């Protein structure tokens, strides 16, 4: 059903979002990844990455020293500068730890397409060291089910993407906020 060219709220879409979140929570075998980056313009690189498990335990948390410029707008959001990251390891040094944390788990990310694009660019830059990346499970996006859960119509059809509620623009804070969001959806609240 459409009203003024906008798709109306669909209870089935909300129910599907709740079912997706419940499947995650009931399995307990997933992790949430979040990152902060150098900005939106290429090249884009990680400056901070965090992974939490279904119990909100921090599996990985760390900053990353990029080898490209950090956009001023990104710094205003997450606070990282080239100077503050000077002592951080480059991506290739933390990559084995990230693989271990993500291996054989469902990986959930808020706005997964963006983080996965940055991940894929980072892994490609590793050359042969990145060959195992193709073995990771696909990443699941929490933003899309949450948009359907909220049910706010988009002018382009479907549902309007929502900002991550309660995120603080740190990788760990946003990973925990995404986990809480999944738990909230699973409860149907």
Language-model features, listed with the residues they occupy:
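Metal-dependent phosphoesterase core characteristic of DEDDh/y 3'-5' exonuclease domains
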Residues: 9-11, 23, 27-30, 42-48, ...
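Short glycine- and acidic-rich boundary segments immediately preceding or forming the N-terminal edge
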Residues: 1-24
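Conserved phosphate-coordination/catalytic loops
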Residues: 12, 85-92, 169-172
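Metal-dependent phosphoesterase signature
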Residues: 76-97
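Short acidic, Gly/Ser-rich segments with clustered Asp/Glu that frequently serve as metal-coordination loops
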Residues: 35-43
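Amphipathic coiled-coil/heptad-repeat helices and related helical stalk/stem segments
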Residues: 17, 70, 91-94
């Amino acid at each position: 059903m459409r009203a003024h060219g906008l798709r109306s709220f669909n209870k089935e879409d909300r129910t599907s979002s709740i079912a997706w979140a419940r499947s995650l929570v009931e399995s307990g075998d997933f992790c949430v990844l979040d990152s902060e980056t150098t900005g939106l313009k290429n090249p884009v690189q990680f400056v901070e990455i965090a992974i939490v498990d279904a119990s909100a335990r921090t599996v990985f948390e760390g900053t990353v020293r990029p080898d490209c410029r950090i956009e001023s707008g990104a710094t205003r959001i997450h606070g990282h500068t080239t100077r503050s990251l000077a002592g951080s390891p480059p991506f290739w040094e933390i990559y084995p730890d990230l693989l271990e944390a993500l291996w054989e788990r469902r990986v959930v990310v808020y706005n997964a397409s963006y983080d996965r694009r940055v991940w894929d660019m980072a892994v490609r830059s590793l050359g042969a060291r990145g060959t195992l990346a193709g073995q990771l499970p696909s990443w699941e996006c929490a933003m899309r089910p949450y948009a359907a859960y909220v049910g706010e119509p988009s002018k382009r059809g479907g549902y309007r993407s929502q900002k991550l509620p309660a995120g603080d623009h740190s990788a760990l804070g946003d990973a925990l906020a995404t986990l809480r969001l999944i738990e909230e959806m699973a409860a149907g609240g």
